[in-house]
C-alpha cells in the first residue's frame, strides 16, 4: 500500500491538474436543487399568480411575509380552482400543492418565507379554510382523494379487443397501433409508470426513456426443452436520475404454454424488432425462429451498431422528428381516447394498471422484491397508496371453515373501473336537436354565420375560439348523456339495441385491411407464438410496422384494373382529394380505376360495392341486385357512403328505395359514390314518405332488413332513428364550403366574381369547412304525421 500523501502534496497534485485555473462557478451564490422543467413552470405560474394578487390589492401593498395576506391569497386560490369531473369543489390536496409550489418558487427568486409562516398557512388550509368556504359560499374543500382504481385483466382485454377487434380510428401510421400495444404491454407486465419507457411529461424534451443499448434480447431453452425468446427492459424509474445503477430491470418472454395471443407481450415487441431489422446477425424472422440455443444458457442476440442509440418505443407521428422517442403526452392521449372508445366514461390510466400489477406482485413475492419491481424505496408506499381497501381476504370462508375464495374480491376490484360496452361516441340525433335549441349554442352558431368567409386575423382568431367553445359544449353534453345512458346486458348475449354509428365502422371497412381483418380474429385465439396462428399474427403485425397506410387498395378496384398506360396512371401525391378522418391519403386512386375500368369495358358493367364483384350485362346486374334483396342479411344497416383510408369502402343506398317493391331491383339498390347526391336523394324520399304516411298510424322504419322493425309516434322520432341507425347526416345542412360554392355560382352567373377570386374564396373557407367537419347540424321539427300533412 503506497504511503499516504501529506496535505501539501495532496493539494499540489490538484494544482498540477489545473485546480487553480478552474474558477468559473466558484462564488457566493446559493446553489438550489435542479427540478424538472415541468416543476419550474409550476413554480413560475404560482409566483405570477401572487404578482397578480398583489396588483389587484395594490392599495394595501400585500407582502408574502405577512401571514394575513398569505391566508387571503390561498383563500382566493381555493375559490378559483375548478374541480374535477364537473365537481366545482376544490380539493384540499390541490390547494396544498399550489401552496408548496408557491413557496418553492418564491424561495428560488427571493428570501424564503419563514418556516413558522409556511407551517401556519398549511394548518390554515387543513383546519380553517374548509369552514370559510362552507360559510361564505356553496363550496366545500374536498378532503378525500379519488379512490384507487385497478386495471384488472378484464380491463386489459377490453382495451385490446377494441384496439384490435373493433377500432374505427385510423392512425397516421399503421405502426402506431403495434407500438402502442407493445408499450402498453411492457408497462402492464412491469407495473411501470407512464414516463419510464417513453419520455415523461416531467422530463419534456429530455429524450429520456428506453433505448436499444439498454435492452437485452436473447433465446433460451425453456422448461419444456423448446427455444423461447425473452427480453429484458430497464426502467428509467422515478427518483433514480442520479442512481442509474439502481434502475429496475424486467424480463418479458414468449411463455411456456397456450395463452390468448393478445396477452403475449413478445408478439408486438418481436414484430417491432423484425420490422426495424434490429439484429446484427439475423435479418429475417425465419432465421430467428431457427435458432437452437444450448441447454441452461441464454444466447444473446446483438443489436446493430446503428440502432443502439435509437429508442425502442419511437414516435410514428410526422409532427416529431423521425426516430425520436415517444412522449407520455401523446401516448396518454391515445390511451385515454381508446378508453372512451372501449366504453369507459372515466378511461383507465397507466397508473390503474400499475396498481393492479403491484397488488399481485405483493401477493406473490417478498417485500424487497416488490419494492425493486415497483421502483420504490419506502416499504410503506405500497400500503399507503396502492393496497386496495378490500384486502383480498375471505372473512366469511375462513370464519365458517369453508374453502377461502379470491374470485369475489378480484371481481369487486375490477368494478373500480366502470364500463358500458355500448357507450355512445356521439350525441344521439334527438340530443343534438336539443343542444341546438340551447341559447349558448345558438348564439355561437349565429356569430359563426356572421364571420363566415371573413379572413382578417381578428375574425380568424375569433372563429377558432368559437369552434373551441362549440366543441366544448358538445363534449359536455356527450359526457352528460354517457353518464345517464342505460347499461343493461341482454340475457341472450346479443345487443338488443342498434349499435352506435361508430361501432359499426370497423365491420364495414375491415375487408380493406387484410392484416387487421385477420388480427381481429387471430389475436383472440389461444395459441403459442410459434404456432401457425401465432406466426400469422406476428407476420401481420410486422406488415403493419412496415406499411405506410392501412389501406393499400380497394378489393374490386385493384391497380391492375386501370387500363391506362403506366405513364398516365394517376396517383395521389398529397393529402388533398378524398381524405379519411385523419386527412390521410392512399396512393390508390379508386375513383379513376372505377371510371377507367367501366369506360374501357365492352358493354354494361358495374361494381357491386356489397360483394366487391364486377357484373357484366344489364340483365345479370338486375339479377344480382335481386339476389341481394332476397337476402336481407346482405343488405347494409348503415346506408351512408363511407370513405376510409382515402378510398370508398361502402357506397350509399336509399332505405326508401330498398323497401319499394314497385321499383326494379337495380333501382332499389342504386349505389351513390358521393355523399352530396346521396343526401339530396334520401332527403327527398323522406319528405315524400312523410306525405304518404297515414296520420292515424304509427310511422314504421322503412329499412327492409330484419335488423330493424321499429315504429314511431312522430315523424321527428323516425328522423332521429334514421339518423342514428341507418342514414347518418342525411338531413345535415350544407357545409360552409357547399354554401360558398352556391354563392360563387350565383355571382358567376351575374358576372360579379372572377374565377381567381372564386378560387381564393374557396381556399379561404376550406379552413372553416375543416373545423365544422363531422359536426352534425340538424334542423328538426318534431311533428306527428297528421301535423305534417
Residue ranges of predicted features:
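Extended, non-catalytic subsegments within catalytic or DNA/protein-binding/adaptor domains
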Residues: 1-590, 602, 759
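C-terminal recognition-helix end and immediately following basic linker
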Residues: 575-610, 614-703, 711-743
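Extracellular/secretory pathway and lumenal proteins
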Residues: 566-568, 658-661, 705, 767
Amino acid at each position: 500500500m503506497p504511503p499516504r500523501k501529506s496535505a501539501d502534496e495532496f493539494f499540489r497534485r490538484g494544482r498540477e491538474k489545473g485546480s487553480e485555473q478552474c474558477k468559473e462557478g466558484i462564488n457566493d451564490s446559493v446553489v438550489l436543487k435542479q427540478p424538472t422543467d415541468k416543476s419550474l413552470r409550476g413554480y413560475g405560474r404560482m409566483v405570477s399568480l401572487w404578482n397578480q394578487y398583489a396588483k389587484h390589492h395594490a392599495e394595501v401593498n400585500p407582502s408574502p411575509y405577512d401571514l394575513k395576506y398569505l391566508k387571503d391569497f390561498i383563500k382566493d386560490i381555493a375559490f378559483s380552482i375548478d374541480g374535477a369531473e364537473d365537481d366545482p369543489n376544490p380539493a384540499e390536496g390541490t390547494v396544498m400543492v399550489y401552496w408548496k409550489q408557491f413557496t418553492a418558487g418564491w424561495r428560488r427568486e427571493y428570501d424564503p418565507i419563514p418556516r413558522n409562516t409556511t407551517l401556519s398557512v398549511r394548518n390554515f388550509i387543513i383546519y380553517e379554510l374548509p369552514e370559510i368556504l362552507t360559510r361564505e359560499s356553496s363550496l366545500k374543500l374536498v378532503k378525500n382523494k379519488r379512490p384507487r382504481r385497478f386495471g384488472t385483466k378484464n380491463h386489459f382485454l377490453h382495451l385490446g379487443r377494441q384496439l384490435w377487434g373493433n377500432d374505427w380510428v385510423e392512425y397516421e401510421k399503421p405502426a402506431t397501433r403495434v407500438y402502442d400495444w407493445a408499450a402498453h404491454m411492457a408497462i402492464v407486465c412491469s407495473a411501470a409508470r407512464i414516463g419510464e419507457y417513453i419520455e415523461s411529461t416531467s422530463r419534456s424534451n429530455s429524450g429520456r426513456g428506453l433505448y436499444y443499448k439498454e435492452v437485452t434480447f436473447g433465446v433460451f431453452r425453456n422448461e419444456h426443452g423448446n427455444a423461447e425468446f425473452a427480453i429484458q427492459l430497464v426502467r428509467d424509474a422515478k427518483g433514480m436520475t442520479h442512481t442509474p445503477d439502481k434502475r429496475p430491470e424486467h424480463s418479458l418472454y414468449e411463455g411456456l404454454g397456450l395463452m390468448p395471443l393478445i396477452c403475449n407481450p413478445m408478439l408486438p415487441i418481436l414484430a417491432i424488432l423484425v420490422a426495424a431489422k434490429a439484429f446484427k446477425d439475423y435479418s429475417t424472422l425465419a432465421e430467428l425462429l431457427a435458432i437452437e440455443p444450448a441447454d441452461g444458457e441464454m444466447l444473446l442476440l446483438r443489436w446493430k451498431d446503428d440502432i443502439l442509440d435509437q429508442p425502442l418505443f419511437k414516435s410514428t407521428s410526422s409532427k416529431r422528428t423521425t426516430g425520436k422517442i415517444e412522449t407520455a403526452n401523446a401516448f396518454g392521449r391515445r390511451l385515454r381516447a381508446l378508453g372512451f372508445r372501449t366504453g369507459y366514461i372515466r378511461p383507465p390510466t397507466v397508473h390503474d394498471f400499475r396498481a393492479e400489477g403491484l397488488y399481485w406482485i405483493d401477493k406473490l413475492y417478498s417485500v424487497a422484491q416488490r419494492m425493486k419491481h415497483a421502483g420504490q424505496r419506502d416499504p410503506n408506499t405500497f400500503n399507503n397508496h396502492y393496497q386496495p381497501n378490500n384486502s383480498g381476504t375471505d372473512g366469511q370462508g375462513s370464519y365458517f371453515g369453508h374453502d377461502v375464495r379470491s374470485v369475489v374480491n378480484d371481481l369487486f376490484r375490477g368494478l373500480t373501473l366502470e364500463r358500458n360496452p355500448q357507450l355512445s361516441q356521439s350525441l344521439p340525433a334527438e340530443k343534438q336537436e336539443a343542444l341546438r335549441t340551447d341559447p349558448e349554442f345558438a348564439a355561437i352558431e349565429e356569430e359563426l354565420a356572421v364571420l363566415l368567409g371573413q379572413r382578417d386575423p381578428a375574425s380568424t382568431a375569433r372563429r377558432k375560439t368559437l369552434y373551441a367553445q362549440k366543441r366544448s359544449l358538445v363534449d359536455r353534453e356527450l359526457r352528460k348523456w354517457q353518464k345517464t345512458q342505460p347499461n343493461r346486458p341482454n340475457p341472450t348475449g346479443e345487443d338488443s339495441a342498434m349499435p352506435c354509428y361508430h361501432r359499426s365502422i370497423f365491420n364495414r371497412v375491415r375487408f380493406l385491411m387484410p392484416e387487421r381483418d385477420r388480427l381481429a380474429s387471430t389475436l383472440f385465439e389461444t395459441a403459442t407464438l410459434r404456432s401457425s396462428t401465432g406466426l400469422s399474427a406476428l407476420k401481420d403485425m410486422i406488415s403493419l410496422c412496415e406499411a405506410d397506410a392501412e389501406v393499400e387498395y380497394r378489393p374490386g378496384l385493384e391497380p391492375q384494373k386501370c387500363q391506362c398506360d403506366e405513364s398516365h396512371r394517376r396517383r395521389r401525391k398529397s393529402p388533398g382529394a378524398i381524405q379519411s378522418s385523419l386527412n390521410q391519403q392512399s396512393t390508390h386512386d379508386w375513383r379513376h380505376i372505377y371510371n377507367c375500368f367501366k369506360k374501357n369495358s365492352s358493354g354494361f358493367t358495374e361494381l357491386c360495392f356489397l360483394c366487391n364483384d364486377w357484373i357484366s350485362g344489364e340483365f345479370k346486374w338486375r339479377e344480382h341486385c335481386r339476389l341481394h334483396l332476397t337476402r336481407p342479411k346482405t343488405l347494409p344497416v348503415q346506408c351512408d357512403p363511407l370513405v376510409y383510408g382515402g378510398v370508398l369502402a361502402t357506397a350509399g343506398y336509399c332505405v326508401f328505395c330498398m323497401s319499394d317493391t314497385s321499383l326494379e331491383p337495380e333501382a332499389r339498390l342504386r349505389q351513390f359514390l358521393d355523399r352530396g347526391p346521396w343526401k339530396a336523394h334520401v332527403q327527398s324520399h323522406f319528405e315524400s314518405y312523410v306525405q304518404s304516411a297515414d296520420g292515424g298510424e304509427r310511422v314504421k322504419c322503412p329499412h327492409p332488413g330484419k335488423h330493424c322493425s321499429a315504429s314511431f309516434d312522430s315523424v321527428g322520432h323516425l328522423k332521429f332513428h334514421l339518423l342514428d341507425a341507418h342514414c347518418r347526416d342525411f338531413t345535415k345542412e350544407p357545409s360552409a364550403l357547399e354554401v360558398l360554392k352556391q354563392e360563387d355560382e350565383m355571382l358567376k352567373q351575374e358576372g360579379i366574381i372572377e374565377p381567381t377570386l372564386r378560387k381564393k374564396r374557396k381556399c379561404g373557407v376550406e379552413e372553416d369547412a375543416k373545423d365544422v367537419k363531422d359536426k352534425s347540424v340538424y334542423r328538426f321539427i318534431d311533428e306527428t304525421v297528421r301535423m305534417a300533412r
